[in-house]
């Protein structure tokens, strides 16, 4: 898992409002890397399996919302490989690569969402280009 932690560090450095994030397997939701210590990403194994399955049909997600780390989020926006969730002053961006799902939970006003999205999508592009 340790090699993947560098990607976690890159995302959190690019968008300091990212409080917790993880890289999980797209097929089964297994955790490849995640934030630790005070900002540990704490989604359960079952929750991650359910979450990665949302990418099978993202068009259905806005009607149902999404759950991550025990929190239910409204999902105002999805794209082919992106899910954006929002709840009060927190939110998440999740993107799918060829073999992974990147999930970044952030805190802050709406203005920080663009920075978080850019950090997550930049890592998505990098991993896709690297074959992941």
Curated annotation (Swiss-Prot):
Occurs in many kinds of cells as a complex with monomeric actin in a 1:1 ratio. Belongs to the profilin family. InterPro entries: PFN, PFN_euk, PFN_sf, Profilin_CS. Expressed in the nerve ring during late embryonic stages. In adults, expression is seen in the neurons, vulva and somatic gonad. Signal peptide: none annotated. It comes from the Eukaryota. Its main location: cytoplasm. This is Profilin-1. GO terms for biological process: regulation of cellular component organization. GO terms for cellular component: cell cortex; cytoskeleton. GO terms for molecular function: actin monomer binding. The lineage of its organism: Eukaryota, Metazoa, Ecdysozoa, Nematoda, Chromadorea. It is found in: Cytoplasm, Cytoskeleton. Binds to actin and affects the structure of the cytoskeleton. At high concentrations, profilin prevents the polymerization of actin, whereas it enhances it at low concentrations. By binding to PIP2, it inhibits the formation of IP3 and DG. Also binds to poly(L-proline) and phosphatidylinositol 4,5-bisphosphate micelles. Keywords: Actin-binding, Cytoplasm, Cytoskeleton. PROSITE patterns: PROFILIN. It holds the Pfam family Profilin. It comes from Caenorhabditis elegans.
């Amino acid at each position: 898992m340790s090699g993947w932690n560098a990607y976690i560090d890159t995302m959190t450095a690019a968008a300091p409002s990212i409080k917790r994030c993880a890289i999980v397997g797209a097929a089964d939701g297994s955790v490849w890397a995640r934030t630790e210590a005070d900002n540990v990403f704490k989604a359960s194994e079952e929750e991650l399996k359910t979450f990665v399955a949302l990418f099978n049909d993202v068009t259905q997600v806005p009607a149902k919302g999404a759950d991550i780390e025990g929190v239910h989020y409204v999902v105002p926006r999805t794209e082919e490989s992106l899910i954006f969730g929002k709840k009060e002053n927190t939110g998440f961006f999740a993107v799918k690569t060829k073999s992974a799902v990147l999930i970044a939970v952030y805190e802050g006003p709406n203005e920080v969402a663009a920075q978080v999205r850019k950090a997550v999508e930049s890592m998505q592009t990098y991993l896709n280009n690297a074959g992941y």
